[in-house]
């Protein structure tokens, strides 16, 4: 057992790269505030090695004052994570409407970017979302699932897409968050060579397998095969 990095106030982001060589971390720093919650305090997002050396700074965000309203968010880079299908690639979202869709109308609320170790190239656009970015479920360079959400309409939309491609995403599901009967659930995942979960594709039939609890007295589990 040994210490990695320096003593600090660490945020909620702390994860090991799929190839187990790097750490993605967030540290909280001053000035603190009584006017915003702790997760909106200034935070620095960076990649360090397993000896604690800083490798790359992704963002150094100031205090965040998120306005009231549906689908508002941070105007700064957010939702950092590792691509589960690559050895050491970080992705994140950036609001194109400065975090306030009512004050700043845009065709796309968010753009998702990525950058790969050794972080000596420009960030690369992964995808765009018309609504607020929620998540990406990875498979490989040719296929992933992109999920966007709207608190205003209470809807989640799931698309199939090719990461970092000019091809338009294809809508797969458009479901109300209040409609449990038609909720397709979550895709079945399997572990890849890095030990990370990726979306399972039944290549024999070009299908995804979806798992859902269901909302019927006759059963609590539903498996759905979806052609992609």
Predicted stretch roles:
Residues 1-228:
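Beta-propeller folds
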